[in-house]
Amino acid sequence: MGRRARGRRFQQPPQPEGEEDASDGGRKRGQAGWEGGYPEIVKENKLFEHYYQELKIVPEGEWDQFMESLREPLPATLRITGYKSHAKEILHCLKNKYFKELEDLEVDGQKVEVPQPLSWYPEELAWHTNLSRKILRKSPLLAKFHQFLVSETESGNISRQEAVSMIPPLLLNVEPHHKILDMCAAPGSKTTQLIEMLHADMSVPFPEGFVIANDVDNKRCYLLVHQAKRLSSPCIMVVNHDASSIPRLTVDVDGRKEILFYDRILCDVPCSGDGTMRKNIDVWKKWTTLNSLQLHGLQLRIATRGAEQLAEGGRMVYSTCSLNPVEDEAVIAALLEKSEGALELADVSAELPGLKWMPGVSQWKVMTRDGQWFADWHEVPQGRHTQIRPTMFPPTDLEKLQAMHLERCLRILPHHQNTGGFFVAVLVKKAPMPWNKRQPKVQNKSAEAREPRVSSHVAATEGNPSDQSELESQMITGAGDSETAHNTENTESNEKKDGVCGPPPSKKMKLFGFKEDPFVFIPEDDPLFPPIEKFYALDPSFPRMNLLTRTTEGKKRQLYMVSKELRNVLLNNSEKMKVINTGIKVWCRNNSGEEFDCAFRLAQEGIYTLYPFINSRIITVSMEDVKTLLTQENPFFRKLSSEAYSQVKDLAKGSVVLKYEPDSANPDTLQCPIVLCGWRGKASIRTFVPKNERLHYLRMMGLEVLGEKKKEGVILTNENAASPEQPGDEDAKQTAQDPCVPDSVPGCDAAAAEPSR
């Protein structure tokens, strides 16, 4: 039977126009298709209400407010990237232009609430409004504001993030020297906050600390990479492991192998998500207590694994978007009991003034899906022991329970500050975990040589933290056969010799997910680097050993850079970790680079990291020069100011740095520095800046972008456009062939732009 015949065989008979389909909730089908859309989800769940009323986590007299807030849509929130020097300028632009335009504005009969700052977030860098994402996307009255949000989000200057999810990174108290592990990082909004805190001092291109962001889902790891890339940090590594058995890493310290313990750990575990009902309305019809019972064990294993890898004196934040004590206090109580005093709950009540929260509870009951309650483990019948575990109940020893101080946990209720529901607990490590006390902190070289390496697949499938600890204990004490030790020793020596961090040469179990390109550090004697060093007059302090590529064969097209600390992690753990991405792009090969003195041009992604080390080919430009460079495709030298022209005319062709320094004596001008990558051609100059970043700089300088569609090109006047007879055309042709050239700026012209400041 042919394909068409098969299709006709199973076709439904035609339905008369306007006839109702009972299977689709009474919707009618007309000529234009289904009318009325899908039936709305009823925001009711009797089991949910019965469960939480019985637990009494909502204060007396507030239940109706609590339920009413859950049925309301979640307000939109945004956070300004705090570490960037442009944060104040973005805040100024938001408050004095976009927010003012929202005053007295109505959309679909609803008055638009002017965004207000979150009272508990520092420096007014987080704001919320009653505008939902749907209204922002659909309303033409808000098109300009929506375009601003999308563009600035892509540039990494703004993050649209739920208010309560901003809390855990703030409570970690991150400092630039901290080594941080984000155990369940995707989609990455909290990870970006952690990166911001590492780069609090913009004058330091390479902080001593770093963030290792992990997620068990291989596909979500790439979403995580996209989020992290917006911040252009050399101190972030994305890895793909099961958080409950994430491998313990080692680093080289003065020739010795030391176990890597983290100063800060974010443990934002998978949960039932009943605190997200305001945005995930599916939870209303799918919620049962079975979700929490099934997740409790995984949550406890992840938290235990995090506690094992936390340094003494370090801080770990455990968080969920669930209000259920089985996922919250029960996990914390079980972890504290297992730690035997090694962990304690920190009192963070004064750390976020303005935040409203409820203290953790010390008594709760467990309910099954069919509504049966149990107050104690001994009440649970034998047939339910696999579903309900002892760790789901509060400790029976009242003295031990009081010593845990579960009231120090924070539970955020939706109706208190118009947010989602959330739970946070901050743990401090006072001593090694009881089962880790016998493990030596430092491994010598002979012990390391005997250490059997574990493939990432084995580590990712190990489910029990205690078993994992036992395995690591054997690894550290040197258990393993001599053949494995011999192979490991050879592998390590090869790693140090060629700097390749990729799959081991010996046959290993196949990893799941996509195969990643290797991370190959460039040897210090590589002939590729001296021309770069000479062309840009790099400072002697430039850490050239931190440069890497993603290929072992052929020409190196792109050079990336990581911090010294992440290089140490990569070189010593290549067989333990499945690394998805790390490093930022700092140089790209030119298509015809051999014609110039240097085959590599600068990449905008890494320019703020590289700039402190560059001593040549820097052109200081004015604000008007920046406007010209960002709104015209290939402006001739004569379009620049006399100061900039005098600098550029004597330079050889090739990549340049364009630097704008703010004038403090003129407060009406842009008050933050700008560093751009450019190309000095034969008679013209251009910038290599991505589209959204261009739009960002233009807005900060008071120019309004007029076009909205991506297909609208740069509006160039006749005097700006280079004709085929003009000398600038050769440069335009050269840059047009370069795959790294960014998109044009849509609908933006310096002459037509209207001031917004």
Swiss-Prot record:
Q: What does the induction field say?
A: By Myc (at protein level).
Tissue expression profile of the protein: Ubiquitously expressed at low level. Up-regulated in tumors. Dynamically expressed during morphogenesis and in adult skin: in adult skin, expression is up-regulated in the bulge and hair germ as soon as the hair follicle enters its growing phase (anagen). During anagen, expressed at highest level in cells of the hair germ that give rise to the hair matrix.
Q: How is it modified after translation?
A: Phosphorylated at Ser-139 by AURKB during mitosis, leading to abolish methyltransferase activity and the interaction with NPM1.
Gene3D superfamilies recorded: Vaccinia Virus protein VP39 (3.40.50.150)
Tell me what reaction this enzyme catalyses: cytidine(48) in tRNA + S-adenosyl-L-methionine = 5-methylcytidine(48) in tRNA + S-adenosyl-L-homocysteine + H(+); cytidine(49) in tRNA + S-adenosyl-L-methionine = 5-methylcytidine(49) in tRNA + S-adenosyl-L-homocysteine + H(+); cytidine(50) in tRNA + S-adenosyl-L-methionine = 5-methylcytidine(50) in tRNA + S-adenosyl-L-homocysteine + H(+); cytidine(34) in tRNA precursor + S-adenosyl-L-methionine = 5-methylcytidine(34) in tRNA precursor + S-adenosyl-L-homocysteine + H(+)
Q: Where is the active site?
A: 321 (nucleophile)
**According to the UniProt entry, how is activity regulated?**
Inhibited by magnesium ions.
**The entry's keywords:** Acetylation, Cell cycle, Cell division, Cytoplasm, Cytoskeleton, Differentiation, Isopeptide bond, Methyltransferase, Mitochondrion, Mitosis, Nucleus, Phosphoprotein, RNA-binding, S-adenosyl-L-methionine, Secreted, Spermatogenesis, Transferase, tRNA processing, tRNA-binding, Ubl conjugation
Q: Its principal location?
A: nucleus
Q: What is the purpose of this protein?
A: RNA cytosine C(5)-methyltransferase that methylates cytosine to 5-methylcytosine (m5C) in various RNAs, such as tRNAs, mRNAs and some long non-coding RNAs (lncRNAs). Involved in various processes, such as epidermal stem cell differentiation, testis differentiation and maternal to zygotic transition during early development: acts by increasing protein synthesis; cytosine C(5)-methylation promoting tRNA stability and preventing mRNA decay.
**Which family does the similarity line name?**
Belongs to the class I-like SAM-binding methyltransferase superfamily. RsmB/NOP family. TRM4 subfamily.
Q: What is this protein called?
A: RNA cytosine C(5)-methyltransferase NSUN2
Organism whose genome encodes this protein = Mus musculus (Mouse)
